[in-house]
């Protein structure tokens, strides 16, 4: 979120610094805190993932100025990756493969019944957090998400490059080898689904 916001501001002629300088003050904070501060009029805007973006619109009267999906090729960019340590992967490949099989099966179940899956996720959020999303927030947020086994590797590299450009890192981090999609592609092939690419950032 921080990188995406600063990058967009820079592209439109605004300046920010990681120490709070520039002509736009960017204050990194939790999504929940952002909602509270926006309701109180203490912040003017926010760059948020779902369901927080929908909550700001529906619960606090915010207006969408930029939909990040419009900034990426085909509207696709990564927000969440499933990760394990290299040590764990090497020591327990069968467990990792079983985890991936579950993730791919869940992806297929969501595609087969998106509305039922949406409602199940809403119930799980309530059970895990004790907080219930309103039906309107849940429906709107879900409509803006795409669940996929594709890591969309090119978007991770682009974000890393942007982080350096806006001063969050001194230089673009070396992401070589960050992906090992070998087991994932085995699971996808066994499921009759297309394999996915590491975008030159690791094994496939």
Ranges and model annotations:
Residues 1-5:
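Secondary-structure junction motif
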Residues 10-30, 40-43, 169-173:
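A local structural motif
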Residues 22-25, 136-146, 174-186:
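Short linear loop/turn motifs
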Residues 90-170:
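Secondary-structure end/capping motifs
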Residues 161-204:
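Conserved C-terminal helix/tail region of periplasmic/extracytoplasmic solute-binding proteins
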């Amino acid at each position: 979120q921080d990188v995406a916001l600063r990058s967009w501001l820079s592209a439109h002629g605004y300046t920010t610094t990681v120490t709070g300088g520039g002509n736009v003050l960017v204050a990194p904070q939790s999504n929940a805190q952002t909602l509270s501060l926006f309701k109180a009029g203490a912040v003017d805007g926010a760059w948020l993932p779902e369901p927080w973006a929908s909550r700001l619109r529906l619960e606090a009267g915010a207006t969408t100025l930029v939909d990040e999906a419009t900034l990426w090729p085909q509207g696709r960019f990564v927000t969440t990756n499933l990760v394990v340590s290299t040590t764990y992967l090497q020591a327990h490949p069968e467990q990792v493969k079983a985890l991936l099989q579950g993730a791919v099966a869940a992806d297929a179940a969501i595609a087969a019944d998106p509305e039922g899956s949406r409602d199940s996720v809403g119930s799980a959020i309530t059970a895990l957090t004790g907080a219930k999303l309103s039906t309107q927030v849940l429906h709107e947020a879900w409509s803006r998400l795409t669940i996929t086994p594709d890591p969309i590797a090119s978007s991770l590299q682009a974000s890393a490059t942007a982080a350096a450009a806006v001063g969050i890192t001194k230089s673009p981090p070396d992401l070589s080898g960050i992906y090992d999609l070998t087991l994932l592609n085995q699971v996808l092939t066994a499921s009759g689904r297309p394999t996915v690419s590491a975008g030159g950032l690791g094994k496939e």
